[in-house]
UniProtKB/Swiss-Prot annotation:
Pfam families for this protein: Ribos_L4_asso_C (PF14374), Ribosomal_L4 (PF00573)
Documented effect of changing K314A: Significantly diminished nuclear localization
Post-translational modification: N-terminally acetylated by acetyltransferase NatA.
Stated consequence of mutating K319A: Significantly diminished nuclear localization
Organism of this sequence: Saccharomyces cerevisiae (strain ATCC 204508 / S288c) (Baker's yeast)
Full protein name: Large ribosomal subunit protein uL4B
Main location (coarse class): cytoplasm
Amino acid sequence: MSRPQVTVHSLTGEATANALPLPAVFSAPIRPDIVHTVFTSVNKNKRQAYAVSEKAGHQTSAESWGTGRAVARIPRVGGGGTGRSGQGAFGNMCRGGRMFAPTKTWRKWNVKVNHNEKRYATASAIAATAVASLVLARGHRVEKIPEIPLVVSTDLESIQKTKEAVAALKAVGAHSDLLKVLKSKKLRAGKGKYRNRRWTQRRGPLVVYAEDNGIVKALRNVPGVETANVASLNLLQLAPGAHLGRFVIWTEAAFTKLDQVWGSETVASSKVGYTLPSHIISTSDVTRIINSSEIQSAIRPAGQATQKRTHVLKKNPLKNKQVLLRLNPYAKVFAAEKLGSKKAEKTGTKPAAVFAETLKHD
């Protein structure tokens, strides 16, 4: 990160004299691919098992008519006097029949995720919260935020009234993001409307605390605002929808505890046997590396630029003499000397004739 120090702001929005060093986790590589892979797997683990009824599609009496009637052998509803009689039943191709391969509750619902991969994704999501461009690209209204990452005094953890908590968020510049959430509430499209998912709305700021002294209850009824403990940060909250750049408000105690949780060059992580991931190259400016004197002295100079013709007309060398000479320069001498029409010279008598003459003399 380009910011080695972060200023702590009071609950009134004023900058204090405290300046905290940036924790090492914010220098972790930002890997959207790993975050997306881990998110899609972890997000499946909270699903509730569902299945169709075992009796669905079979709650009727139907028998096949057998062969000889020039109709399909599918079971058919008996009786008469109604349109249902004679109709096919049970099969998945029939109206009112069961589905193909009915769903079962013993499906494998959970997905195993590598422990280190999950930690890598969480560290990347934390590092992305400190990049203002990613936070803006995710849709958060942080134009009036003093700085990112935003660190607030630890007094925020002791607030027990929702009115006071909302006033503190407004004071630090998060009011625009709260209004965005309120205006985004819309009726869900689809069948989720009558499956207890009737409304949709955007995500607001995530408040990370070190110790809950009332902040969780104070903010739990504010639309879009979520809370999380710094010791158990969740990827589903840090990167909702696998989109990096969640707007996070850190308390001072939580911000200073990040090095203890994730570790640094001097402090060991509380996670057993874990070390923070590091970049493959220390300098992200690849152009500067390529143009450096050390690299330029070791590579050969660029040759002449070649321009590839967009369309090449292929010509037959057997019919086009210029193309033939380009492919085989010896063809000119071959034609001038008429070597193709000359007969091969006899080098001498055949061995069989010599052998016959020898026998005659003997």
